[in-house]
């Protein structure tokens, strides 16, 4: 097995929205805001080479939205999903599986592209099976008013219409040790219904793709919960259990949205779970 970090683009969001009720004087220490109160964020995907499979976890925002749409998120840097794949020696048609942690636009936008004539949409990865789960799919296709702006039909429905969609089986246990893609999956409901957190056994390590359970290293303290979470009081125990397990088992936490800290470990302290070590992707993958 080989793992590759795939940078799909950098963007910015309001720091207050990213940290909920936590005062700016606190979160600004780890995630400094610009003059517009926005903080730097990444869309860092993970590519898994495993035998004959080439599995892409999440896809970033993609490039099919309008300039006005992207203007809201102040895109920065030169990263692009397809270009990042090429830099690793791959083409989009090589991808066999696309695993979507959830269907918010910054995680699944790159899964669907314009067709050649710009008259409609098509899946970006023609030879891939797309993986979601049934609970989350229904949640996203019949969205609540709060999340509706994050679940864009053009990112979601073409996947189903293509016939490439499959669902990861859920169970009564929130952690599946061995999914259809040969890695573990933790299901969490605080951010959105049945977000999926991959746990990948790699050499002698466990790599956890944290998605929006832990978007940045600045979100490690327990009360530091995003304002975007639909059930913040559920995020708290989910995050507490996860971080304690991560500290006890020395998990390597792959941060999808942290523009500056790629992979981290955490440790127990008198103040709770805190940052332990920071690694670049080249140190670990």
Region annotations inferred by a language model:
Residues 8-9, 59-62, 103, 135-136, ...:
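Active-site metal-binding loops of divalent metal-dependent hydrolases
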Residues 48-51, 199-203:
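Active-site beta-strand termini and strand-to-loop segments that position acidic
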Residues 55-57, 99, 130, 207-209:
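Residue-level marker for buried hydrophobic side chains located in beta-strands
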Residues 72-83, 201-285:
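Cap/insert and terminal regions of metallo-dependent hydrolase folds
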Residues 76-79, 84-90, 94-106, 122-187, ...:
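Metallo-beta-lactamase
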């Amino acid at each position: 097995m080989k793992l590759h970090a795939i940078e799909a683009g950098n963007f910015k969001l309001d720091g207050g929205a990213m940290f909920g009720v936590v005062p700016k004087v606190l979160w600004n220490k780890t995630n400094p805001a610009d003059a517009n109160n926005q903080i730097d964020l990444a869309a860092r995907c993970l590519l898994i080479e495993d035998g004959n499979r080439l599995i892409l976890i999440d896809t970033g925002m993609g490039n099919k939205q309008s300039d006005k749409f992207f203007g809201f998120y102040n895109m920065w840097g030169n990263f692009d999903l397809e270009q990042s794949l090429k830099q690793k020696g791959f083409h989009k048609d090589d991808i066999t599986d696309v695993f979507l942690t959830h269907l918010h636009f910054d995680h699944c936008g790159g899964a669907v592209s314009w067709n050649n004539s710009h008259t409609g949409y098509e899946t970006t990865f023609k030879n891939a099976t797309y993986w979601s789960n049934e609970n989350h799919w229904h949640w996203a296709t019949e969205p609540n008013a709060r999340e509706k702006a994050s679940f864009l039909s053009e990112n979601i429905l073409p996947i189903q219409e293509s016939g490439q969609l499959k669902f990861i089986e859920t169970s009564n246990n929130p952690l599946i040790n061995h999914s259809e893609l040969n890695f573990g999956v933790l299901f969490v409901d605080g951010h959105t219904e049945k977000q999926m957190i991959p746990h990948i056994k790699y050499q002698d390590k466990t790599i956890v793709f944290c998605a929006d359970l832990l978007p940045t290293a600045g979100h490690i303290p327990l009360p530091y919960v995003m304002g975007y979470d639909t059930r913040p009081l559920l995020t708290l125990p989910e995050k507490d259990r996860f971080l304690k397990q991560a500290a006890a088992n020395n998990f390597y936490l792959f941060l999808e949205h942290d523009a500056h800290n790629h992979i981290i470990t955490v440790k127990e302290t008198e103040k709770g779970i805190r940052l332990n070590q920071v690694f670049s992707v080249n140190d670990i993958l």
